[in-house]
Amino acid sequence: MTVWPAETIPHTDDLYMRVHRQWTRDGAPVPGAFQNRDGGMSTEWAHYSTPDETRSRGRVPADNGVVKMHVGTVRGLPNQTVVHTPEKTNRAHTDVLGEKDEEVRLKFCRICSWVIDPPRTPTKRSSK
């Protein structure tokens, strides 16, 4: 059980989400970055987190960028619900619930903006 109560997140607030460099192409997130895992898409409520804190919670923080999404805009996407789901060690944890078909994932790509740029994926050098 969590020690933090679930709260109602205002439409005017923002969410942060880590995006691993494998889910980027040409500096932009690809639709596959926006998918449910364990029932929802894990994000963090900006009221209780910063972009740096969000990034630091990744397995290898340096492999991730962080995007920002406006809660009201996320709620305006088809069948998407924003629910504060705090965890014992992360009061900011928030799930975005709802099916994320290709159309919805493309819309997530359009509504997000980088607050921490992703690292460039190293390119393989050709041997001569």
Residue ranges: model-predicted function:
Residues M17:
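A positively charged, amphipathic N-terminal helix/segment that binds anionic biomolecules
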Residues M1-D14, Q22-K128:
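Conserved NAD+-utilizing ADP-ribose enzyme module
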